[in-house]
């Protein structure tokens, strides 16, 4: 939408900050906005959050917008992230994917579906299992890789359907791509693709 409005050509002398949140920003758009901000003396800040944590859990400092392109950044002051293999096993190694878990004073106490639920008190204890899969690099910056529910276990290996979609979009530009499936089979839908290229796609993924 901003491109159609010719945002990058607008005379916005009062604009000092640009922020983004609400969904993972594609790396190419992240880089484009970061480079625009740097070239015009503005600050571009990417953020990550969920309603259950009062909207914000992380931010990517403007100075790292290009260097850490694609990252959701680091935890906000007072907060902390962990990468968990399961509910009790923390992943310590960098660049290893697991569920992103946040701890902080801004985590909701829980959900009340009736008046009696209000008496339960704090059910979360300041800890939120986000349902997002992520990894942490060697410098402590976090990257969302997909949703926990969008993983399949095929031939003993965990397959991220979000990563497969991104991989194919990078190779086949202009093609609409969606993945779905069960643990024993993944289905890939590609609109705008020559049916004769199916074998090529299969070889590319294997």
Locate predicted features.
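Short, P/G- and charge-enriched loop/turn segments at secondary-structure junctions
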Residues: 64-71, 118-123
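Gly/Ser/Thr-rich phosphate-binding loop
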Residues: 2-68, 80, 87
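Beta-strand->loop->alpha-helix junctions that form or flank phosphate-binding loops
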Residues: 44-52, 72-75, 179-182
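AMP-binding/adenylate-forming catalytic core of the ANL superfamily
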Residues: 104, 109-110, 131-206
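Conserved ATP/PPi-binding loop(s) of AMP-dependent carboxylate-activating enzymes
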Residues: 74-78, 89-121, 159
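Residue-level signal for well-ordered, solvent-exposed loop/turn and beta-edge residues enriched
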Residues: 82, 89-90, 141-143
């Amino acid at each position: 939408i901003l491109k159609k409005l010719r945002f990058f050509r607008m005379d916005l002398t009062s604009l000092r900050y640009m922020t983004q949140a609400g969904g993972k920003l594609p790396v190419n758009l992240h880089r484009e906005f970061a480079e625009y901000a740097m070239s015009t003396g503005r600050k571009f800040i990417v953020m990550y959050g969920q309603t259950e944590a009062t909207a914000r859990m992380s931010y990517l400092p403007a100075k790292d917008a290009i260097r850490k392109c694609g990252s959701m950044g680091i935890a906000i002051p007072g907060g902390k992230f962990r990468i968990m293999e399961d509910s009790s096993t923390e992943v310590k190694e960098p660049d290893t994917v697991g569920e992103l878990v946040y701890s902080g004073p801004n985590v909701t106490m829980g959900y009340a579906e009736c008046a009696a639920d209000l008496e339960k008190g704090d059910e979360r204890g300041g800890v939120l299992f986000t349902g997002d899969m992520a990894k942490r690099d060697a410098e402590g910056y976090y990257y969302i890789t997909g949703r926990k529910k969008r993983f399949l276990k095929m031939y003993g290996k965990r397959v991220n359907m979000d990563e497969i979609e991104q991989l194919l979009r990078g190779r086949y530009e202009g093609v609409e791509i969606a993945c779905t499936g069960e643990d024993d089979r993944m289905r890939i839908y590609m609109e705008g693709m020559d049916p004769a290229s199916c074998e090529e796609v299969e070889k590319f993924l294997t």
